[in-house]
């Protein structure tokens, strides 16, 4: 597991994806990509560019979370020939990845913080009971996330 859920930018996401590709001993590689926020007018271009970096020869799955990722990363990755799953939220993404992961998989989880909350995907994948090591776990963040995830119930 590569937990890079604190925040994201085009350069950081590209570097994280290249790091995932560098693991030679992985039976499979899965990437969970969330929106990169605060990109303004360049959002479409940057999300599409990241999607086009997804290599079907190196990735078993591309999982997206967030509206920009659904609109731009997912189609670009599909055009490259990748298997893509669009998740409604981070928890659903974690459940999906857990259902398709086999044996020696390496999973990269990368996205911006606001309304993406990919640390919750990591929590699902790791079956974590003690989550103090994850980002955004204090009472204020947990209340904000609880309110956010209510829309999916």
Predicted regions and their residues:
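ATP-dependent carboxylate-amine ligase
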Residues: 1-153
């Amino acid at each position: 597991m590569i937990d890079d859920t604190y925040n994201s930018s085009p350069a950081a996401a590209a570097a994280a994806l290249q790091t995932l590709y560098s693991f030679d001993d992985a039976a499979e590689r899965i990437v969970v990509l969330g929106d990169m926020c605060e990109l303004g007018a360049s959002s479409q271009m940057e999300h599409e560019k990241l999607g086009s970096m997804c290599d079907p020869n190196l990735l078993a799955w591309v999982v997206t979370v967030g509206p920009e990722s659904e609109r731009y990363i997912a189609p670009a990755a599909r055009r490259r020939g990748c298997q893509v799953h669009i998740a409604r939220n981070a928890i659903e993404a974690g459940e999906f990845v857990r259902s398709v992961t086999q044996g020696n998989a390496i999973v990269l989880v990368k996205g911006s913080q606001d309304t993406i909350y990919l640390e919750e995907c990591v929590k699902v994948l790791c079956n974590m009971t003690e989550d103090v090591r994850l980002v955004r776990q204090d009472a204020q963040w947990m209340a904000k996330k609880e309110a956010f995830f209510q829309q999916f119930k």
